[in-house]
Amino acid sequence: MAAGGELSYEELLDHILNNKPIPNIVEVPNVTLDEGLASTPSLRPRPRPWEGQLQHQSHQGSLDKPNISLDIDQESLEGMTSLTRLSECYDIQSKLQINDSDNDNDDNNNDNNKGDGNDDDNNTVTANPTAR
């Protein structure tokens, strides 16, 4: 036996031919398990790269045509889509946009109006030096 517990090639052949146990090798019995003991896999097999692309394309095709049922009666649908109701919604939206733009202008004016507390902060006053 060589140093470090390793067998030379000739020693390994001698162990194999004479059916001697080989050091540092675990004997594993040749046992076949009963198929009835096998459990069912909980994970499905991973798709191969080319299969994944095919499934992705088929899912996109099915997503293009969703089957959605709406629980809306005809009267409420007509009420939501009537021209007067739509014009009211647009009117409210335009008023909100005007209010938002007014608030934005007020915010800008408030930022510019910061001063010493006088109301005349926006007015420009030039001081004339007095002669002595």
From Swiss-Prot:
UniProt keywords, alphabetically: Phosphoprotein
Residues covered by region (Disordered): 36-69, 97-132
InterPro entries in alphabetical order: KPWE_PEX14_dom
Phosphoprotein found in the keyword field: yes
Phosphoserine: modified positions: S101
Domain of life: Eukaryota
Subunit structure: Copurifies with proteins HOL1, MMP1, PEX7 and PLB1.
Miscellaneous field: Present with 538 molecules/cell in log phase SD medium.
Protein name, entry field: Uncharacterized protein YJR012C
Species name: Saccharomyces cerevisiae (strain ATCC 204508 / S288c)
